[in-house]
Amino acid sequence: MSETVVPGGASYAAAGVDIEAGDRAVELMKEWVKKTQRPEVLGGLGGFAGLFDASALKRYERPLLASATDGVGTKVDIARQMGVYDTIGHDLVAMVMDDIVVCGAEPLFMTDYICVGKVHPERVAAIVKGIAEGCVLAGCALVGGETAEHPGLLGEDDFDVAGAGTGVVEADRLLGADRIRTGDAVIAMAASGLHSNGYSLVRHVLLNQGGLDLDAQIEEFGRTLGEELLEPTKIYSLDCLALTRTTDVHAYSHVTGGGLAANLARVIPDGLHAIVDRSTWTPAPIFDLVGRTGSVERLELEKTLNMGVGMIAIVPEESTDAALATLADRGVDAWVAGEITDRGEHTTGAALVGDYAG
């Protein structure tokens, strides 16, 4: 029985999915993905799965695999409005791999998921370029990913990104709450800006309530508001690994959603408290702008934004100088921001005290 061909019948392209545009995006991103390759990576882009030679883990006595999945939230809307896409890829790597390094794990590889309303090959390639550049900074390989076109669910210019990463740590070198002791120092590492959390509040306050334009020059920033908001999230992975190799690090805390105190509390054991002194640093002007424009209370800011601290290291008090020297050698702005105590006046695992400097 022969099939009847109906002129103008339905097709995938007519439904809004452009396979050829997707293929073009893959071709454009290949050169960037190659830059992330590690010796353990087998095969190339375009297979059904990314391959990583696990025999490389034989040098570990008891290797533990660490995994994390994350995205960059509504910061993607700033990128969309600004027409800048590569920085979002950088942000994605930071959000995923800096969660992995917290337990002492070395980042190994990552995969990404890019969801778009319509495939614009150059835009997708720019996002992947940023992911690849971030992977190089984190020391991991980009072994695969997925670009999904969702016409009807997303507008033609809309997109979102997510990623998953894997790392490895020797079992007896796993960092965390069980290593923390009274008297340990809390070392803060400076953030590059807002990073990738709190953008729903920031967008609401600055763009909706404040009526500010992303192209507006902001004197305190020395650049436009949009450029400030798109400042890439700092990637601390290799800095933390270097610190772990040279110093007796007890724990790390990646300051993301929920703010400094809430994330620090996640690694503080029962019976101990982390006391962080606000007077040891001055938050960047962007935090003050958000607070002033929206009349946002300090506690609300601190529950939502990083307030200038992107990563915390907890080390023995006697290791403080060595830790700060290692970070300084790597160009990381860091300082002693507090201590671990067993005093019971604070009911939560971490608390901010005092007032910010400046």
Where are these regions (language model features)?
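Glycine-/charge-enriched secondary-structure boundary and capping motifs
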Residues: 2-14, 123-141, 154-159, 213, ...
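N-terminal amphipathic/basic leader segments beginning at the initiator methionine
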Residues: 2-40
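Hydrophobic face of alpha-helices
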Residues: 26, 125-128, 199
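Short helix/loop capping segments that flank catalytic or ligand/cofactor-binding pockets
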Residues: 60-61, 75-76, 196-198, 263-264, ...
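Acidic, glycine-rich loop-and-beta core segments that form the ion-binding/anion-interacting portion
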Residues: 182-227
